[in-house]
Amino acid sequence: MKFVIAPDSFKESLTALEVATAIETGFKRVFPDADYVKLPMADGGEGTVQSLVDATQGKLIECEVTAPLGDKVKSFFGLSGDGKTAIIEMAAASGLHLVPPEKRNPLLTTSYGTGELIKLALDLGVESFILGIGGSATNDGGVGMLQALGMQCLDSQDKPIGFGGAELANIVKIDVQQLDPRLQQVHIEVACDVNNPLCGECGASAIFGPQKGATPEMVKQLDAALSHFAEIAERDCGKQIRDQAGAGAAGGMGGGLLLLPSVQLKAGIQIVLDRLHLIDYVKDADVVITGEGRIDAQSIMGKTPIGVARTAKQFNKPVIAIAGCLREDYDVVFDHGIDAVFPIIHQLGDLSDILKQGEQNLISTAQNVARVLAFKFH
């Protein structure tokens, strides 16, 4: 008997590794002699660093970088077990949660700290990057990040522009001569699950600006600034980023990253599936178990359980999902490779208590799932 356990984290309760371990514990009460493969998963969003560090026996690197409003903030990134890959979450340096609601203003916020994380990882000699760009506070086209890496965005006085989305309107020249040369030797995979272009009614400013504090007038100003940046970038860097799918992700960070030498925008879950070689483990599995904190109709939009299920179904393997909770529309996942879904909440209660009981409830639910499977396998 072989079980592959490949869940995402249960947010605010358990990491993906803790979820996988709890499921294994429950199953071992019924199948003590089975073979178990635990693969902590993620979809490129929050928790991706921790999951990939755990899955590769890597480590977290703590550091201090520039926060969205220019002050300093404690941050981190992950290093894979072999030391060759850095895993970075943009939100750890340039995240919306780092800016108090009353101070959120994408005219002013910068992605400079994300560039500093990349540079710190380069100092460790990494060969590749996985970069998650969700949850950002910025709308600066990734220019702050590029500045931290040595790219010069100069104004009419031949001086570097300042921080923030508004400053992009002042760019008259982009000089790549001082861009960190080590970037020529590394490949960057960007976890990007949106297809928005850089500018226009479906662009970064219009779609994502308001949630970062932009008023309707700010949206117009930011969009014009990004459009101007794209024009200068095409002239000075020879790359057309305005209409590229995904360029509008994370306030234009997708577009800014495309100006670097070797960058690929890719679905977050696919990056993780490929890096952890899930397909190699499910080929000879008897059952695949996945899960996440909540399963609903949104789960089919690039979330971990469906990514795992689709991989398993290439080999016609049964897939069971265990979730913290379910919404009424959860059954849509049955059309996307998941065969059964089990919630772990056993009784109503205060949310904080339910979160505290998450591990024990997960073990108990996993044991019950295993007991059902025992009818087939024993």
Swiss-Prot record:
Keywords: ATP-binding, Kinase, Nucleotide-binding, Transferase. It catalyses: (R)-glycerate + ATP = (2R)-3-phosphoglycerate + ADP + H(+). Pfam families: Gly_kinase. It comes from the Bacteria. Signal peptide: none annotated. GO terms for molecular function: ATP binding; glycerate 2-kinase activity; glycerate kinase activity. GO terms for biological process: organic acid phosphorylation. SUPFAM superfamilies: Glycerate kinase I (SSF110738). The keyword Membrane does not apply. The keyword Transferase applies. Its EC number is 2.7.1.31. PANTHER family: GLYCERATE KINASE. Belongs to the glycerate kinase type-1 family. This is Glycerate kinase. It comes from Haemophilus influenzae (strain ATCC 51907 / DSM 11121 / KW20 / Rd).
